[in-house]
Regions:
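Structured, helix-rich domain cores that form ligand/interaction pockets
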Residues: 1-150, 161-198
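Helix-turn-helix DNA-binding segment
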Residues: 151, 155
Length: 198
């Protein structure tokens, strides 16, 4: 099948890649404080309870859109049986298009470098900086009312936090463990190399 697909196209490439990771049994209140801190659009969707159910970063038409959503809630609404031992399940999903799809490995790393929360800020952070970060995360529209150099300062602080963040580092490790196998599989689809049909 892979050889057949390869023979059909002169320059085979991916125009879209969806890469997802499930986050299981991390409390909802902990997860919902995470943000992609890049200067891209942010669209949160809240349920009737007022709790975050889905968050989008980037527009649907952009080359990169990141979505964080309550996968357990989605499954329950679709009447999918969820194992009783799973308390929470969130999914972080990156949808990449055009050139970003081809450069999927770097785009995942870049997205994770911007996936931050207030949970693991440096212990020596100034109290005023912690208050501002809490305010920016609680009310993302506040980003639009602060000066450009101030935005840069707090984005940089959050990106530093991302390097110490236990959850984000776990996602990095999981991706690192899977990336080589995923790349090998994608390469065989694209290039028809080293494919043994059984």
């Amino acid at each position: 099948m892979k050889g057949f697909i390869h023979d059909l196209f002169l320059d085979p490439h991916f125009s879209r890649a969806d890469i997802a990771c499930d986050i299981v049994d991390v409390p909802d209140d902990f997860i919902t404080q995470y943000r992609i801190v890049d200067p891209i659009s942010f669209k949160p969707i809240y349920g009737r309870s007022g709790k975050l159910e889905t968050a989008y970063w980037g527009s649907r038409a952009s080359e990169r859109q990141v979505r964080l959503y309550n996968k357990k809630l989605e499954q329950e609404r679709k009447k999918v049986i969820v194992p009783k031992e799973i308390d929470t399940r969130w999914r972080l999903e990156m949808q990449l298009r055009s050139g970003k799809a081809t450069d999927w490995h770097a785009m995942v790393q870049e997205s994770l470098d911007s996936f931050a929360s207030p949970h693991f800020l440096p212990i020596d952070i100034k109290p005023i900086d912690k208050i501002v970060i809490d305010g920016l995360i609680a009310e993302p529209s506040n980003w639009s009312i602060i000066a450009r150099h101030t935005k840069y300062k707090y984005r940089n602080l959050l990106k530093q936090e991302s390097q110490n963040d236990e959850l984000t580092n776990h996602l990095r490790e999981t991706f690192k463990e899977s990336a080589d196998e995923l790349k090998k599989e994608l390469d065989t689809w694209l290039l028809g190399l080293d494919v043994t049909e059984k």
